[in-house]
Amino acid sequence: MGYAEKRGGYWRGRYKIEDGKYGTVADSAGVVVKFATKREAKQAADAEEVTVRRGQWRDPGLGQETFGEYASRWYAAQDLAASTMQNYRRHIEEHLLPDFDDKALAGILRTDVDAWEKKERASYAASSVKTWRSTLHLIFEDAIEEGLLTSNPAARRRGRGKRAGRSRDRGPEKVVTDALGILLTAERASLLSGRDDEFVATVLKGYTGKRWGEIVGLETEFVRPNAFRVEWQLYELDTGELVRCPPKDDSYRDIDSTDWLSALVFNHIARTKPTPCPCHGRTYVFRGQGAARTGGHQGARLVDVARRAGVSTGTVSNVLNHPDRVREDTRVRVELAIAELGFVRGGTTSEHAAHWRRNGFATWLFTPAVSGWYPKKAPQEARPVPILGEPWPGIPARGRGAAARAEACWLPIAKGLTPHGLRHTHRTMMEDLGTEKVLMDERMGHIDGSVSARYAHVTPGMRRRLMAGLTEQWEAALALRRALHPRSPVAALDRLLRTGG
């Protein structure tokens, strides 16, 4: 049985945990409870011994570790895909630590979590906040498993809260296009890049539904006569590193290909003659767009010269391009800074960047292609793509004064469409063709765990019907494009228009 112990002006309760080990009655924060009477202390000690005998006792000192300390330990113990680790790190550092870092685990209440969620929802999409709360819930669940907590303050209680307005938690409907939209977008992306690679990649994405990382990470050895094998992807981390890793959810698969699509990709490989990339030593179907800069951020930048010379970046630019516009003493100061910092104008370049960057591709190629506008990117505001009207559908004007030389601009094809939206588009096109769900899931790399899916299987007939349907959609899109103009400045498309696809 427990007993009371006199300590100066108060009593404390003592109880037996195991042979030779006694505990002191404490509150939920691990602070010793000071009782006014011997009887109260004895009763509390007896109650603690009952929980010990029932196997329900936990050390009140546990859970006093701060959330920040525990989250660091928790993250270090995870052994997951690089993409998952990156997401967890971002969730913890950017959204959880600012509110919970210094709080003891046991001191975080459900009301604290609800208040945090309400604050986050005021600034971020509901779907994002839901993901961050799921990460918080997972961390607390592991703390419970370690015996640090008895309940999860991030757990949601069923049937609580407002029902009205829950539909607003849905994300905005994904913009999709059709076969002609894919073709026109691919043509414009190619015109913006100045080469055929983006035309082939955009058509491939639209007619296979491959994920972005699966397109960038497509190796030549996995291009087969009638299929594209998904064995790897290249996942871009926040650091800029591209990691070669298995496809999402281990969705290894063969995606059936139409004859015309296989020919388009094989001709692209024959034309570009890809070589192994320096970063992975693998031969990829597609190269990055533009030059790979080895100067730039790795060496002195324009802004570094400006800071060194105590002038604006515009003044440095004038010294480099129009030295006659700059005062002599300023020019000398800038040239001295250039020499001191070893600034190299433009850096040294190789032929091409090894791989596309998700943000660069979407910002400067895909978004302008589908909307006809370059997006807002500080310090520049959103602006129409300046177009020289001939040959149709127009060539993007480049260099200084491009806007003044422009003769036309592009109308939107599908404003709001994203590269991932082509994956939604492919699924929509298959739905339109009446494709069986089991085949659609196979192509998309989705797993259907339902009982009905267990008894559904893909047949050769299903595959043939889908290939015929996709070919019909492609040929119809080519015919519509040919009706707009019989030729194209994009060489790959021009050949298809002249030969009938």
Ranges and model annotations:
Residues 3, 34-38, 73-153, 193-194, ...:
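N-terminal core-binding DNA-recognition domain of tyrosine site-specific recombinases/integrases
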